[in-house]
Amino acid sequence: MANIKSKIKNISRIETARVKNAAIKSRVKKAIRKAREAILENSPKAQELVNKAHHEIGKAVSKGVMHLNKGARKSSRLDLFYNKTKTQ
């Protein structure tokens, strides 16, 4: 445990950021999972859920929780999965 007052505050700040970042990452994972499940079930809401997943990924990238390239990769792979299953 830190003894310096500023470092104690820093630990608290880091913990707050960690919790927020974990929540954002969890939202992204849930959105992607729901979109993939809807795609596999040929649900009529699949396109809507894919758009929601893209939105969550974009928010995570803009907040700096996810790297730009990782966000682009996740969006691209979700689109590829959607298009591949839609044509079958």
From Swiss-Prot:
GO annotation, biological process: translation
GO cellular component: cytosol; small ribosomal subunit
Highest taxon listed in the record's lineage: Bacteria
Transmembrane segments: none
Keyword Transport: no
Keywords linked to the UniProt accession: Ribonucleoprotein, Ribosomal protein, RNA-binding, rRNA-binding
Gene Ontology MF terms: small ribosomal subunit rRNA binding; structural constituent of ribosome
Tagged with keyword Iron: no
Role summary: Binds directly to 16S ribosomal RNA.
Assigned protein family: Belongs to the bacterial ribosomal protein bS20 family.
Alphabetical list of NCBIfam families matching this protein: S20
Family annotation (HAMAP family): Ribosomal_bS20 (MF_00500)
Name of this chain's protein: Small ribosomal subunit protein bS20
Taxonomic source organism: Mycoplasmopsis synoviae (strain 53)
